[in-house]
Amino acid sequence: MKPTRPFHQTPVITIDGPSASGKGTVAALVAASLGFHLLDSGALYRLAALASLRYTIEAHDVDALVKLIDDLHITFREGLAQLDGVDVSAEIRAEEVGSRASAIAVHAPVRAALVARQRAFRKEPGLVADGRDMGTVIFQDAVLKVFMTASVEARAARRHKQLIQKGFSANIDDLLRDLRERDERDSQRVAAPLKPAADAKLLDTSALSVDQAVEQVVQWYEALVPHA
């Protein structure tokens, strides 16, 4: 007889970590490996921001923003962010969208609506959620919590490579400085500071390939849920 799961809800794997730690790529591949749903929580805020711009909803119109967020048709598939079934992965990285995301996130009802949308991604057969507070705030009962990190030098090198491959100019020293400043802000903020959950497994990817990181997360999950 197969053992029963040691929890009563749909399993969730959370993968948190600082910027450029590789958590998004690893989360997408872990989800694909296990056949789980995927949540890119950072992209969710930008998707809401993009939709508000498309529908010309003002950043201060809280009621309209909350209704918009409740009605959004959002999916994450193979690392792509889709709005109403259309890939908008590139569009949500625009500076205008980032600025709007920051502007709407200051409203508590908007943040609450986005938290509810994040939790709604929890569906059978399971969910892999990546972000900064997935294990500490959003899915505190996750069966596996992973906190991914890497040296700031390794993260800057990865970000530099990504930008160059996409045709953007990039300066490694500027990237190093930006990452250090962002790490400081994220770790010191009052609301949901960036930190590992008390029961998280730490995964330093400084010297690991993407495949090695994915394999480690899958092994951890299968050890916790042997019949998965």
From Swiss-Prot:
Its main location: cytoplasm. It is found in: Cytoplasm. This is Cytidylate kinase. Signal peptide: none annotated. It is an enzyme of class 2 (transferase). The gene is cmk. GO terms for biological process: pyrimidine nucleotide metabolic process. Gene3D superfamilies: P-loop containing nucleotide triphosphate hydrolases (3.40.50.300). Keywords: ATP-binding, Cytoplasm, Kinase, Nucleotide-binding, Transferase. GO terms for molecular function: ATP binding; CMP kinase activity; dCMP kinase activity.
